[in-house]
Swiss-Prot record:
UniProt cross-references to Gene3D superfamilies, sorted A to Z: Vaccinia Virus protein VP39
InterPro entries tied to this protein: Ppm1/Ppm2/Tcmp, SAM-dependent_MTases_sf, SAM_mthyl_Trfase_ML2640-like
Full protein name: Putative S-adenosyl-L-methionine-dependent methyltransferase MAV_1058
Pfam family, one: LCM
Alphabetized UniProt keyword annotations: Methyltransferase, S-adenosyl-L-methionine, Transferase
Superkingdom of source: Bacteria
Length: 304
């Protein structure tokens, strides 16, 4: 189903299913002999969602290589593991720099407030759809998980007035903040909503604040991109999942996040997926393994 203004979803459908896919990949990565990252909460969260293909991937019943070949997403598990590690390292560096206020927008099924070692005095704000926040909180509570920082959750759509909700939850704009928008600015918001998101973050960011995100579009409407999306959609359907990446992304020219932040006084550094693989100690992507994710950019920024 094509995206529309004000549409809704859950973790088993539409764009929400991609959050479950990423969590399943983190669970699979955690099972490896020398894991790039460790997320012990990913598997129980994926099981609770109940999508069969992702439950099997998370639990080890499904060979990741077989799935990646079938859906046409080479090195999928490595890709999401490297991305997760990139942002985990970003938060570690922010903590060492003295930042004690964190905002994760569209947090999905990642349990960073539970699985990372935060410095004493850190407050983490998580923003996502109300149903996603409620589901994750309830599931983690059932398995006895406890946050490793002060956690404040805000259930709201990013297309609504989330800055007001964030401040109502106690966010202090006078304190430097470490922001994260993982897997958000890659076509899952309308282009104008991407700009609003960035333009809302900057005035809430004191000097020394940091920002990290991936950006671009998983479907640029080119013939090659459209054909790749078709093959991937057919692969997921063979696995019993109706997930059409092309239909999940909004059309239009998406935002060059690094350039936009740079114009607003942020010092930015950009990376490619190959940089993330190298930093994680993973074998580099071959030419045959280059897919839509390899076209995305990654940015870290500091507010001056």
């Amino acid at each position: 189903m094509t995206r529309s203004e004000g549409d809704t979803w859950n973790l088993a459908s539409s764009v929400g299913a991609t959050a479950t896919m990423v969590a399943a990949a983190r669970a699979a990565a955690t099972r490896r002999p020398r894991p790039v990252l460790t997320d012990e909460y990913a598997e129980p969260l994926v099981r609770a969602v109940g999508l069969d293909v992702f439950t099997k991937l998370a639990s080890g019943e499904l060979d990741p290589d077989d799935l990646e070949r079938d859906v046409g997403f080479a090195r999928m598990v490595d890709t999401f593991a490297a991305r997760g590690r990139f942002y985990d390292d970003y938060f570690a560096a922010a903590g060492k720099a003295g930042l004690r206020q964190v905002v994760i927008v569209a947090s999905g099924l990642d349990a960073r407030p539970y699985r990372l070692s935060w410095p004493a005095g850190t407050t983490v704000y998580e923003i996502d759809q109300p149903e996603v926040i409620a589901f994750k909180t309830a599931t983690l509570s059932r398995i006895g998980a406890a946050p490793t920082a002060e956690l404040r959750t805000i259930g709201i759509d990013l297309r609504q007035d989330w800055p007001a909700a964030l401040q109502d939850a106690g966010f202090d704009a006078a304190q430097p903040t470490a922001w994260l928008a993982e897997g958000v600015l890659i076509g899952f918001l309308p282009p104008e909503a991407e700009v609003r998101l960035l333009d809302s973050i900057t005035p809430l960011s004191a000097e020394g604040s940091r920002f990290a995100a991936d950006y671009g579009s998983l479907n640029d409407a080119s013939q090659a991109s459209t054909e790749q999306a078709r093959r991937t959609t057919e692969g997921w359907r063979r696995r019993g999942l109706d997930m059409d990446i092309a239909a999940l992304t909004y059309p239009g020219k998406h935002t060059d996040v690094a350039a936009h932040l740079g114009a607003d006084g942020w010092a930015t550094t950009t990376f490619g997926l190959a940089d993330l693989f190298a930093a994680a100690g993973l074998p580099e992507l071959t030419e045959a393994e280059q897919g839509p994710a390899a076209t995305l950019s990654f940015v870290r920024a500091i507010k001056s």
